A protein has these predicted regions:
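Helix-loop module immediately N-terminal to the HCX5R catalytic loop
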Residues: 105-106, 112
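Non-catalytic substrate-recognition/targeting regions of SAM-dependent transferases
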Residues: 11-101, 108
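Conserved SAM/SAH cofactor-binding pocket of Class I
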Residues: 112-124, 129-152
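Intrinsic-disorder/low-complexity coil detector
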Residues: 1, 76, 127-130
Length: 152
């Protein structure tokens, strides 16, 4: 039986999981295709031809010398989400680019709730005021930025 892999992420034109397997994942951040380790991707890649498009690869075979390797000059991608521009960075010692795209469904929820809050106040003819948000995932600051841009 073929393996059916689905991502639990909302649509975002600046991020895409292209393929995964052999303990790696192939992703597109804006126009930059990267390869990063993913220990839970134990299956075989499904779209082998796409892997040639990778221009940045995180090498973490030796944890002490974990680093990014590039094919040519590669600029860190800028990701756009509405009015927000997220500046990413390739950092040796970390496979992350400073943002977790899989959090986008949560950012969508934050934005949606801010809009519902404003509509609720308007329906009750109450003076506009800012909703209150407690951000419990503040590691990168992305959720806080989305919240601020949404009116929190």
């Amino acid at each position: 039986m073929p393996l059916n892999i689905q991502t639990l992420s909302s649509q975002w034109s600046d991020y895409e999981l292209l393929d995964s397997g052999d303990r790696l994942k192939l992703e597109r951040f804006a126009d930059v295709v990267v390869t990063r380790s993913e220990p839970k991707a134990w299956w075989k890649p499904a779209r082998k031809n796409l892997w040639r498009e990778s221009v940045a690869r995180y090498i973490d075979d030796d944890k002490k010398n974990a680093r990014w390797e590039f094919r040519g000059k590669v600029n860190a991608p800028v990701l756009h989400l509405g009015k927000i521009n997220f500046l990413t960075k390739f950092m040796d010692g970390s496979k992350h680019l400073g943002i977790f795209p899989e959090q986008k469904p949560h950012w969508d929820f934050i934005t949606e709730r801010a809009g519902l809050f404003a509509k609720k106040l308007a329906l009750k003819s109450l003076a506009p005021r800012k909703p209150i948000l407690l951000n419990l995932f503040g590691y990168t600051g992305a959720a806080s930025i989305v919240a601020a841009a949404s009116g929190y």
